[in-house]
């Protein structure tokens, strides 16, 4: 793992030694933060089949509506992204994270304005403990990185996968618009697809899974997130005050509602709190694609959609810009609280 305030990369033998011993204090969480790691319910995250999305669109929209309103998350199968593309992006993430340390070192940065960033985790600088993972971030749209600036290990896989994600994202925003009772192009016309960045996580095996987390409890500062996880598991969501496993489903993609969409829908859709547990087995790989321009320049002002408001349903949030929201979100860190509360009227 990358050590705080130091650009130091351990050899594979050193990493293996660390994984076989114990969790360093910098990653340790207090016991009360980890006393509920086992699922506390038998709930199951909704699974929606997109195979008939064009023939039975209304039925799919109703399922998305129910999931977005009650869960804030759902899994999609038969979504149109080839299995070979899903496998290749996962393989590409592994190839990069298991590259020679000197190769990865050249990409290490804490500068969020760079188009490709390799880092341990930003929580080390804003929270009391770090998370047990390595990650890289890449901005793919609207101003994609020069392919030559991307690591060879994952370059083609990232470019290919992001094209499929943009296509699926377009369909999802149409269906979500219809689920709100609006024209299908409403969310796209409001700029919800203006930005896409990809965060690729590598969770090494953890010698003491009861001592730390892979990712702390948080919601996403996005419109929506499209997540691909491998078969190891560990992702949990908070539903009705219970932690629920998001069980791996081969070939499926996970869609979760982000903070921006909860605000814009005036709480009609909910942004889901989630976290990732550590595991003695690994590495665990996940690829999260965020529809959000994040810290990139964007002066668009967002707020509750006027067509959804009425005397009985007045605005619950004040307006915001994405850079403004993202700055506060990052400064706050993954402390288990929602940044949405700062915008509630």
From Swiss-Prot:
Q: Does the keyword Ubl conjugation apply?
A: yes
Is Transmembrane among this UniProt entry's keywords? no
Question: What positions does the domain Fe2OG dioxygenase occupy?
Answer: 194-293
Q: Which residues bind Fe cation?
A: 218, 220, 274
Q: Which Pfam families does the record match to this protein? A: 2OG-FeII_Oxy (PF03171), DIOX_N (PF14226)
Give one GO biological process term: biosynthetic process
* SUPFAM superfamilies cross-referenced by the UniProt entry: Clavaminate synthase-like
Q: What class of enzyme is it?
A: oxidoreductase
Binding of 2-oxoglutarate occurs at 284
Cofactor(s) essential for the protein = Fe(2+)
Question: Which GO molecular function annotations are given, in alphabetical order?
Answer: dioxygenase activity; metal ion binding
What PROSITE patterns does UniProt report for this protein, alphabetically? FE2OG_OXY (PS51471)
Can you tell me which family this protein belongs to?
A: Belongs to the iron/ascorbate-dependent oxidoreductase family.
| Entry protein name | 1-aminocyclopropane-1-carboxylate oxidase homolog 7
Q: Which source organism does the UniProt entry give?
A: Arabidopsis thaliana (Mouse-ear cress)
């Amino acid at each position: 793992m990358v050590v705080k305030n130091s650009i130091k990369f351990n050899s594979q033998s050193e990493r293996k030694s660390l994984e076989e011993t114990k969790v360093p204090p910098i990653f340790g969480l207090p016991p009360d933060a980890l006393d509920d790691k086992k699922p506390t319910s038998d709930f199951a995250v909704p699974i929606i089949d997109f195979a008939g999305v064009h023939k039975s669109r209304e039925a799919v929209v109703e399922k998305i509506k129910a999931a977005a309103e009650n869960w804030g998350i759902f899994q999609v199968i038969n979504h149109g992204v080839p299995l070979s593309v899903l496998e290749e992006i996962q393989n590409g993430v592994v190839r990069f994270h298991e590259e020679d340390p000197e190769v990865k070192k050249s990409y290490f940065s804490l500068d969020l304005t760079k188009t490709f960033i390799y880092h341990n985790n930003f929580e080390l600088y804003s929270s009391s403990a770090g998370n047990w993972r390595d990650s890289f971030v890449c901005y793919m749209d609207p101003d994609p990185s020069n392919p030559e600036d991307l690591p060879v290990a994952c370059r083609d896989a990232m470019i290919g996968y992001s094209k499929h994600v943009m296509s699926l994202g377009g369909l999802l925003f149409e269906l979500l618009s219809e689920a709100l009772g609006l024209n299908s192009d409403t969310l796209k016309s409001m700029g919800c697809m203006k930005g896409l960045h990809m965060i690729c996580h590598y969770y090494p095996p953890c010698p003491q899974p009861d001592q730390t987390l892979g990712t702390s409890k948080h919601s996403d500062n996005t419109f929506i997130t499209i997540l691909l996880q491998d078969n190891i598991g560990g992702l949990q969501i908070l539903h009705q005050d219970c932690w629920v496993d998001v069980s791996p489903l081969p070939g499926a993609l996970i869609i979760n509602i982000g903070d921006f969409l909860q605000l814009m829908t005036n709480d009609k859709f909910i942004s889901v709190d989630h976290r990732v547990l550590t595991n003695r087995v690994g590495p665990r790989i996940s690829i999260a694609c965020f529809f959000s321009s994040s810290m990139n320049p964007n002066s668009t002002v967002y707020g509750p959609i006027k067509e959804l408001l009425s005397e009985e349903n007045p605005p619950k949030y004040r307006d915001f810009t994405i850079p403004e929201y993202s700055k506060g979100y990052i400064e706050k860190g993954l402390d288990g609280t929602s940044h949405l509360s700062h915008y509630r009227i």
